[in-house]
Amino acid sequence: MRHRYILIHYHIFKNAGTTILWALERAFGNAFRSVDEDFDHGRVPKSELVRFVKQNRQVAALSGHLFCLPAPKHERYRFLELCFLRHPLDRLQSAYHYTRRLENTDDINVAQARALSLPDYLLWLRENQPYNLINVQTCVLGNRGRYFFPPSPYHLERAIACMRELAVLGIVERFDDGLIAAEFYLKSVFPDLDLSYVSQQVRPGRPVTLAERLDEMRRQCGDDLYRKLEAWNDLDLQLLEAGEAEFARRFQFIPHIEQRQHEFRARCDALRDQRMAA
């Protein structure tokens, strides 16, 4: 039986997902679907995902916030999973700045982000929405996105196992390398895959390096709250460490890497120049 391959992007909030979505839409055209509007009633059961793929025969790539890991096993379809991990505190800071720029005044998170400083907003999340603050990525990978209580080391173990089974693993701080790896490892299925991109939703004036952004966050939050945030996200920090090691292991096997990096950057620069000239 000939298998149909579908690339599925797990869009974790503020893990560079909008830029990945942009790259996928450009690469796959009409064969790509962002499906959050198709599934607006909570997490997507595996049976519904299979039904959706069966009903939309042109689809070769999907992106959404609501998919459950791992993807379903199916005799006809082969789901190739893509997910990027990010430093959890950097993700929280990015989420705050993004949320306060939104125009939806009816959203309680938008209202609170606009009204509160970063530390006060994070404390508000701690009180009212801990599922948006504590070990979010461990919850997504290790507990199918369900959050009735904070994830445990048991869920971390499951998250790491799930991470290691991803067809495409990326680290936000090595974003270009992650997409280069995706192009390389998926070429047997998608031989012409081009994931060059133009960055989306980048905060104006954002410090360039992770260390600079974390220093900025520590100054704003103070040492005491910053240490608490690290403690509240200890599982995500361990997941990131394991993810970085697994990504490095995979990346070392890609041949001619410096040439690939140069060519990928040139493609991205060309896209950016085209957009600026338009």
Could you tell me what each predicted segment is?
Residues 7-37, 43-44:
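N-terminal pre-catalytic "stem/leader" segment of glycosyltransferase-like enzymes
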Residues 1, 262-278:
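Membrane-proximal basic amphipathic "stem/tether" segments
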Residues 21-25, 167, 179-183, 237-244:
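Non-transmembrane alpha-helical segments in soluble domains
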